[in-house]
């Protein structure tokens, strides 16, 4: 770098005109100007490098503020221009203005045009590379305006301790149009909002960075300069702007960052030893612009309205403090090998002279310590030492083939000492001639070693960062692996439990199949008994038909007798009373017989009521049994095979009940016929005075009724036996369920032990580098398995609810039917129909359960396959973890060997890379404006020629091409 020089920060003050709202409000214009560098506010003067009044044009502001910085940047200096002020004070108008309006454009578009114009007028031996970046600081986060996906960039420092934004997009440009297109693109992504004071209020600090690198193709001298163009967001008072919600949060962050900027300015102005650059990302980025290696110009924008007087004073005070800050600037130059060599030789000679001076002073000190008195003319003299240094430096510049002249020795030596020194000097110059080539080689070697050292340091730092990142990633993957192991083990345990339950269910299905076979045998026996009963019923039907015929014959004879008696009564009046008396007597006998029959019927009704009460009790017991059966069925819902056997048994019961219904219908018909026959027989017996025959008929009827009663009683007893059998079956099922619960508890204890064992084993796993994709696949498979099991459980639960609802509905209907009709045969029919409905519903439930069982059996192979696949994945994960550990140990052993190769690769990569992203460099040559389209990679030639090509194009003066 060149020699250092100090310069103050330049502060320019600009006042905007009163806006429409301020004029409508009647605000006063409070600014008074004294000359071109002073403004008076409330009788207090504020002096700056330049003060611009409200009528100043954009071009005049640019010429005074920024035009000189263009030359500085192209000569290798860093430059910064930023606008500061309250909201709606004209900062964005000053920095950007109307980008494509020749009169209204601000500093940024004008300075871009001037940079290229200045380049075109420079020496043709210079070659320029220009790249631009555009980012904003929004909510104290750095956001790339050229790539909106980069929303939180970080600030780092390069090897020279200069801050830069890491990862920010850098674009190479070769014409003003390309730069303006980049600005338009970034501006469209910037955050703006509407407030009470500004319709286009900037909600972020925007920074447009232009990086210019130039190289002299003849002297190989390289210069670089950076230009920061900053448009700060304005400070806000919430009471004036009316900010709410997100706009209020933005205002808080804006005021916070501007406060940090004010603290930095104050610390620099006061000469504080500590400057709080790190309080804000904005001050961190502008660290070199404030008190560092940069020529900085601050444009403070103020409002002349009395409404904003306090904010205007605060802005002016900020500018006055900033004006006192001094920056130390120097040219950013990259020395060539020859320049480094000359500098090395110069420093080496200075070091040699200093050694001689030290030796002289040590000799003089030793003489003083030994008690000698050194004369004044032999004592050390600084002027003589400087003369000696000048003489030595002058002699070094001579060519090596010229004879060396003796250097006068400082002090008054004896002749012998002087001759000795001259001989020694001659020898030294001869050695210098011999060592010139060695010095050149050493200087080149030093340059290479420095480059290698820097590369190694950078590589070591990047390797350490990569190692830390890999270690963090490894720890995270290890934690995820542990969690996935736990999940897989839990799922495996659940699958094992399902497999055990399935085996138990299969055993129970076999048991129930055997029970079903036994019940089938019993059903065959019952069918044989039912066949015998059918034969007896057939005999009864034949007897009834015979009695019907006999009763019909007796009725016909009785009608004939009654007709004859009627004729006799009608023809013989004397016999009419007798006939009447005989008829009355016969009716009396009939009434007596009927009254007897009524009494018998009443007794039968009482007996029927008793039977009904008994049947009601039995129904209640049946309901209780049905409730118990429902509870059993809820348990049986988990044991599908048991439900199958019970439903088959209920089908058999349904057949029996249907047969009983048919027999009851036949018996009821016979009972009606018998009652009619009884009436006929009574009339016949009364008419013919055959009481004995009537008694026999009555006894026969009573015998038939008694047989019917006994048959009904047998049916009731058989139903009771069946209920008792079902109760016994329910008790057995409860015992089996209790055993299963005990078995489940034992399995749970074993599960806890296995789980503890698995947890102890899982602690031994420490590292996992790969297999993330396989773990995700296993998780998806397990998720599908869980969904399948959940669906099956939900189906069983729905079936249980439907069964309970249907059973409750049937019980309710049965109670209503019993309360509505208490007749004998009708009540039996309703109960039989109720049982039929129950049986149909149970049949449907049974079929549904059979289908569900079949579906579960179909799903079982899939689940077993998934279980095996999961086990294989677990084994693969364990083997992969083991391999990862082995690979890690091998990698550590090969680390030293790999470092050397990585250094070479990184060094070549760094030489080829010119930024954070790979782009095509577009060199620019002075000579003439470009004529190529900005959409194609092109370069500029002096004389007006240009070339379009897919590769970077270099341009030289004179119109010649160079690809």
Curated annotation (Swiss-Prot):
GO BP: any one term: axon guidance
Q: Where in the cell is it found?
A: Cytoplasm, Cytoskeleton; Cytolytic granule membrane; Lysosome membrane
Q: Which residues carry this modification: N-acetylalanine?
A: 2
- Annotated residues that bind ATP are located at 85-92
Q: Residue ranges of region Disordered?
A: 908-963
* Residues bearing the modification Omega-N-methylarginine: 956
Q: Topology relative to the membrane, per the entry?
A: Peripheral membrane protein
Which InterPro entries does the annotation name? Kinesin-like_fam, Kinesin_motor_CS, Kinesin_motor_dom, Kinesin_motor_dom_sf, P-loop_NTPase
The protein's UniProt keywords, in alphabetical order, are: Acetylation, ATP-binding, Coiled coil, Cytoplasm, Cytoskeleton, Isopeptide bond, Lysosome, Membrane, Methylation, Microtubule, Motor protein, Nucleotide-binding, Phosphoprotein, Ubl conjugation
Domain Kinesin motor: start-end pairs: 8-325
- Domain of life the protein comes from: Eukaryota
Q: Locate the cross-link: Glycyl lysine isopeptide (Lys-Gly) (interchain with G-Cter in SUMO2).
A: 213
SUPFAM superfamilies, sorted: P-loop containing nucleoside triphosphate hydrolases (SSF52540)
Q: What is known of its domains?
A: Composed of three structural domains: a large globular N-terminal domain which is responsible for the motor activity of kinesin (it hydrolyzes ATP and binds microtubule), a central alpha-helical coiled coil domain that mediates the heavy chain dimerization; and a small globular C-terminal domain which interacts with other proteins (such as the kinesin light chains), vesicles and membranous organelles.
Family listed: Belongs to the TRAFAC class myosin-kinesin ATPase superfamily. Kinesin family. Kinesin subfamily.
Annotated function? Microtubule-dependent motor required for normal distribution of mitochondria and lysosomes. Can induce formation of neurite-like membrane protrusions in non-neuronal cells in a ZFYVE27-dependent manner. Regulates centrosome and nuclear positioning during mitotic entry. During the G2 phase of the cell cycle in a BICD2-dependent manner, antagonizes dynein function and drives the separation of nuclei and centrosomes. Required for anterograde axonal transportation of MAPK8IP3/JIP3 which is essential for MAPK8IP3/JIP3 function in axon elongation.
Tell me how this protein assembles.
Oligomer composed of two heavy chains and two light chains. Interacts with GRIP1 and PPP1R42. Interacts with SYBU. Interacts with JAKMIP1. Interacts with PLEKHM2. Interacts with ECPAS. Interacts with ZFYVE27. Found in a complex with OGT, RHOT1, RHOT2 and TRAK1. Interacts with APP (via cytoplasmic domain).
Its name, as the record gives it, is Kinesin-1 heavy chain
Instruction: Write down the species.
Output: Homo sapiens
- Taxonomic placement: Eukaryota, Metazoa, Chordata, Craniata, Vertebrata
